[in-house]
Structures are given as structure tokens and as C-alpha cells.
UniProtKB/Swiss-Prot annotation:
This is Uncharacterized HTH-type transcriptional regulator MJ0361. Keywords: DNA-binding, Transcription, Transcription regulation. GO terms for molecular function: DNA binding. It holds the Pfam family HTH_45. It comes from Methanocaldococcus jannaschii (strain ATCC 43067 / DSM 2661 / JAL-1 / JCM 10045 / NBRC 100440).
Length: 107
């Protein structure tokens, strides 16, 4: 399920924008020029998988603006998407060296 979500069109663009700053729905929609239903679907998937957090900001109106922010898990997903993009640009004879370590952050 995670790979299916990350492979969706515009997911990387959303994560990149949220990596630079928290944004509300209409900011994302205007910046990406996406239909609201498409953006809502992408954001719902990202929130459900823990890549993005959703919170309601203060507002004098009945409905406040909903802000979205990238989570640490979302930042790691963005790094993986960047790595995949780099892998796609490799030429014959080139290789990627990856150093990684899995740590238990609850210890």
C-alpha cells in the first residue's frame, strides 16, 4: 500500500512543498494547480499513512484553515523518492552507494 501511494502522480510534489513549510489546502491547490478532489485524495492517503499531519488553525470563522505538515516519516519517504529519481538517471557504468542504518528510537 505504501509504495502504491508514493508512486501516485503529484505525491512527491506535495511532500516537497510541505518539506519547505507547512501549508493549508488552498495554498497547496493553487501552487500545484490540482483539482481539489485530486489533492484531497492525495492528502488523505498521506495523512492515513503517517507521511503528513493535518491540523486546524485558529480562525474567527466557523471552519478554520486546515494546515498540513510533513512528518519525520514523510521526510524519509521523500528521501527515498529522491533516491529513486537519482537511480532513474544512472547511466551505464554508474552506481549508487547507499549507507543506511535501522535504529530503534524507542530504546
Amino acid at each position: 500500500m505504501i509504495l502504491k501511494i508514493l508512486a501516485k502522480k503529484h505525491v512527491k510534489d506535495v511532500l516537497k512543498l510541505l518539506n519547505s513549510k507547512d501549508m493549508y489546502f488552498s495554498e497547496l491547490q493553487k501552487t500545484l494547480n490540482l483539482h481539489p478532489k485530486i489533492l484531497d485524495s492525495i492528502l488523505s492517503d498521506l495523512v492515513n499513512e503517517g507521511f503528513v499531519e493535518k491540523r486546524e488553525g485558529e480562525s474567527p470563522y466557523k471552519f478554520g484553515k486546515v494546515y498540513y505538515s510533513i512528518t519525520p516519516r514523510g521526510k524519509r519517504a521523500l528521501e527515498i523518492l529522491d533516491l529513486i529519481e537519482t537511480f532513474d538517471t544512472l547511466r551505464e557504468g554508474q552506481d549508487i552507494v547507499i549507507n543506511y542504518k535501522i535504529v530503534n528510537s524507542t530504546a
